[in-house]
Amino acid sequence: MMFLRDPSAYHGENNKRPFFEGWYHKLVTNDGRALVIIPGIYRSGFNNNQTAFVMIFDGDTGEVFYERFEVQQFSCSTSSYSLHIGSNHFSSQNIILDIESEALTIKGQVTADNLKPWPVTLFEPGCMGWYAYVPTMECFHGILSMDHSLDGEIEFNGSNYDFVGGRGYIEKDWGRNFPENWIWAQSNNFSNSDLSITASLATIPWKNTAFAGFIVGLYHKNNLYRFTTYRNTVTKEIHYDSNKFSWQLRQNDLVLELTIEKGHKAGLLYAPDKMDMGPRVPEYLDGN
């Protein structure tokens, strides 16, 4: 029997191991300054290591700050996205930050309005489609908002980020392990203010083999165009070199051509392995 569950909610009840879950908030000011804020939790299946965390990726400098918390300071609903880590609070509509440590001081509040989530239905419960019902998947993915407006401000290591009139994006990952390899890109800062895109391509273990699974969503004028493996989208062309990724997709009579270029300031985001979270994922906030 299929059971519809909100992808945004916490999936790590009963202290299952190995397990990780992280919510990715991208915040961009009206003049293009970007912060990524990722709260989450990790539990090793190899040892007793476990931690809650808040990760901050500074688009101005490429620096990544990773603050650990005791798991007892982590509290999240299993029916909706409402997360507390210490004195910090996270949801789709609101972020409250209050962290002061040796390396990081960040305080403030940002609210989100007019969110555009990937639709969740019984037969297509979010961006993973029917794959979301396969319990043996190593990693699950959810898109909480393709695009939304922001308000508020954050004081971050002596610098002020004013998010009045800014734009945001929220997604998340959870499961036992990250994919072996993947490419991911997202943007909702175009000259056309009603345009947002997210694209991911990964090697997905499947029984005794693997396949290339992908999720591409294009939001435009209140319509979400879905180019995905489970909708039988076809890759017509694909090319990757050290700086540029080109991809052509066909979904029935729709053709989408993507060209993604690396930026110049890479930050190493922390990601799970068998033992711990570590700086393993290069990401750019200044790509094209």
Regions found by a protein language model. Name each.
Residues 1-288:
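Structured soluble/peripheral alpha/beta segments that form catalytic or ligand/cofactor-binding pockets
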